Structures are given as C-alpha cells and as structure tokens.
C-alpha cells in the first residue's frame, strides 16, 4: 500500500486505507485560544481570511495542535462575492451582512464573472503554502458555498430564520432567481477549479441552507445548480474528490446522492446506518458526530465516534462532525475527538 498520497485523499478516492481519516468542519476557529488571541489583534474577519499570512497561520493552528488528516483553508463561503461585485462584511456574533441585497434584474445583470486569480489571489497563495507545509501528512481541503446558499445570503442580505425574502423571489419571480443561481454556479465552478489548481486536493461544497427547502423545491432551486458545479469541475478535474454538505439533509439525502459528488457529508440528525442504507454503495460518507457532544465527557465522545465508524464500516468513510465545531467547545475535548478518531478502528477491533 502506497503512502505517497495523504490518507484522507486516498480514502476520499475510495482506495483501501489503513484507518479511517478524521478532520473537523470549522476546526480552525473560536474554540481555540490561539485563534481568539489572534482575533483580538486582528478583529476584522475579512482581514483574517483575506490576508494570506493570517489565513495561513489560522489554517495551520489545528494541524499544529491536533494533527488532523485534513487541513482546510481558513476562509468563508462568501469570500468570492466581492469578485462578482457584491460587497459584504461579517460582524462578530451577528454573521454576514450584504450592504446591497440582490433583488432586481439590473443588479443580477451587473454581476461580474468571477476571476479568482485577479480578485482573490490570496486564496491560491494560502493553498499553495499549506501544501508545502503539510506535505503528505494531511490532505489540503478547499471549499465553496453552493449556489442556493450564496443566493440566500445575497437576497436576504443577512442570515435568516425563515428565508421569506428568497422564497418570495422563488415563488413570485422564479426566472429572476434562476438567473442568479446560474451565475453563481458558473462562478463557483471557476472558483473550485482555481482552488484545485492552487493546491486543494479534496473540495467540499456547503449548501448549508438547502435543508430549508421542500424536496420538490430542492429539486428546482438547489440540486440542478449543485450538479452544474460538479459537472463543470469534473469536466476538467475528474480525479478530485468532491464532498457535499447540507445542514438538515434528512429529507433530501437520496437527492444529494444524485448530484455527481463523491462523498455525502451527513449531519448528526441522520443515523449513520440509515444514511449508508439510503445512499448508493459507490458513494462515500462523511460525519457525523453531533458537535454538541464535544461538551460532554471523553467517554461519551469516544462511544459516539465508535458508533459512527462501526455503522459506516464497509463504506468509504471520513470521520467528521455533523456540523462545524461550536464556539466554547473545550479544546481538550477536540483533542479527544481527533485522538479517538485516529485509534477508533483499533478500539472497534478490540471490542469485536
């Protein structure tokens, strides 16, 4: 068995691997003291994510602390928006704010095609530096927001509890929304290609708010554009594994499996055994420990990891949380998660 490629990359490709790889969504962030200390010195999120030295440093913090099998770019799904002509800010404890929400045909027609090399070269620089730093000790992950979720932010203008504004557009002006979604699909595919060319070995698409759609509306406003992104990327980078994550995905799990991605990331509301049974065998799975469990005891964390990995046995599986790690999570418990993840196959074997 060759170890010339990182474990997580080999697992994501469906190769036989020596153990289950593990990483964590939002593994670089507020639960880590080193991140909070840096945030105190650089309070602007956009500066932290768009200054290549800061983004690189933050991306490496969890790798230096826990040695996960994946190192993900520290960035945000909204980072490409200014390159399309949409300005935004991220306010601490409030989330993203879009200065001028996109709600008219003239605004959509004014959007620019994304040219990542020109408008966000810092992303390419950070990905290249991460590859140089981690070598084959970890896979470098890139990520994007899917078209529906990006549209939800730019139409609503901020995070939302009921998504009334974009749903009003969907049901009153569907042609307008489809134009916006198509623009995002083309630009996001361009952005993913840029990330891969810059050093990302595995990429994840977050359609965080697609779980707010009924299955029928998911088929209309989310899935076709997820698939469009996947098709465009696979046409030029067929060997790069692609992961799809949706928060609250239980109602659309089978539909996710038809988008062309390689791996479905399950949230914690789906039992791992049920998720595996509902998805075609050729698809890998990622997840899916409840991030809230990391406030519990080490014993409870270990037990839940063993349960998830045991239920995913026989499948291509990447251990992860079912959502991003929560602020305030004890760092020692994050350490338990990673250490258990690296030894869980032995734990299952000894208990068998």
From Swiss-Prot:
Main location: cytoplasm
Keywords: Cytoplasm, Decarboxylase, Lyase, Porphyrin biosynthesis
A Gene Ontology BP annotation from the UniProt entry: protoporphyrinogen IX biosynthetic process
CDD domains per UniProt: URO-D
Pfam families reported in the protein's UniProt record: URO-D
Site (Transition state stabilizer): 76
Binding site for substrate: 26-30, 45, 76, 153, 208, 323
One GO CC annotation: cytoplasm
GO molecular function: uroporphyrinogen decarboxylase activity
Domain of life: Bacteria
Pathway connected to this protein: Porphyrin-containing compound metabolism; protoporphyrin-IX biosynthesis; coproporphyrinogen-III from 5-aminolevulinate: step 4/4
Family matches, as InterPro entries: UROD/MetE-like_sf, Uroporphyrinogen_deCO2ase_HemE, Uroporphyrinogen_deCOase
UniProt EC number: 4.1.1.37
NCBIfam families reported for this sequence: hemE (TIGR01464)
PANTHER family listed in its UniProt record: METHYLTETRAHYDROFOLATE:HOMOCYSTEINE METHYLTRANSFERASE RELATED, UROPORPHYRINOGEN DECARBOXYLASE
Function description: Catalyzes the decarboxylation of four acetate groups of uroporphyrinogen-III to yield coproporphyrinogen-III.
Subunit annotation: Homodimer.
Family of this protein: Belongs to the uroporphyrinogen decarboxylase family.
Protein name: Uroporphyrinogen decarboxylase
